[in-house]
A protein has these predicted regions:
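Conserved "landmark" site that anchors the functional core of diverse proteins
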Residues: 1-209
Length: 209
């Protein structure tokens, strides 16, 4: 399994989410970047809904207690194994005793680690996702911290076609996006001209208020 040496800023166990309980007030939770998480699982031979570790901004440091094949996808948070850079979107063998760490935020804000065979995390209401607000799912319903240990369900030190288990760094599309807008209950407070201007204008996102 893995031993958490440092939990980082916000590191949780997530899968594709907990569906069917919204009417009781339980949110779906799940990974923020479904594409990156799915690709990580595919690279190590898992089902795409298998639980992964989701890392936000400043990543964790973890020690492996047994051999395991992993894949790191998503943003570039400076993943290293024993100080050597890890290629993202590739299946990689981590040996027992080695340490996986994340050294910074170089591109993107979230990264994902998939583990061949999955993590030994209990299923709660059909999902292994962590719901921090409700303290449900994942690892004791909370983010990972120093001293936490998670076992692997079916670790693998070898997978067929290892050299081919790689996916080129994906493009997340053009710089311009067309957004879908749903009109609200007060849309009749605006003129037709105003609504037309709103729907057909170009907007720029910035860090200015």
């Amino acid at each position: 399994g893995i031993q958490i040496i440092n939990g980082g800023f916000l590191t949780t166990v997530q899968d594709m989410g907990r569906y069917g309980y919204q009417e009781t007030g339980m949110s779906v939770s799940g990974v923020m970047d479904t594409r990156a998480a799915s690709l990580a699982n595919i690279l190590v031979g898992n089902d795409t809904n298998e639980a992964v570790i989701e890392i936000t901004m400043m990543g964790p440091t973890m020690k492996f207690t047994e051999d395991e094949i992993i894949a790191v996808t998503g943003g570039d948070l400076g993943a290293k194994i024993d100080g050597k850079p890890v290629e993202r979107y590739r299946a990689v063998l981590v040996k027992a005793g080695q340490t996986l760490s994340f050294m910074g935020m170089y591109g993107g804000s979230r990264a994902y680690i998939a583990f061949a065979g999955g993590l030994d995390i209990p299923v709660v209401m059909g999902s292994r996702s962590t719901n921090l607000k409700s303290k449900v799912g994942g690892y004791e319903g909370r983010k990972l911290g120093t001293g936490d240990e998670i076992a692997f369900r079916a670790p693998a030190s070898w997978l067929p076609h290892m050299a081919e288990r790689v996916y080129g760094l994906p493009s997340y599309g053009a710089k311009e996006w067309t957004l879908r807008v749903v009109m609200g209950p007060q849309d009749d407070c605006f003129t037709d001209k105003g609504i037309n201007t709103f729907l057909n204008s170009t907007y720029t996102i910035s860090n200015e208020y």
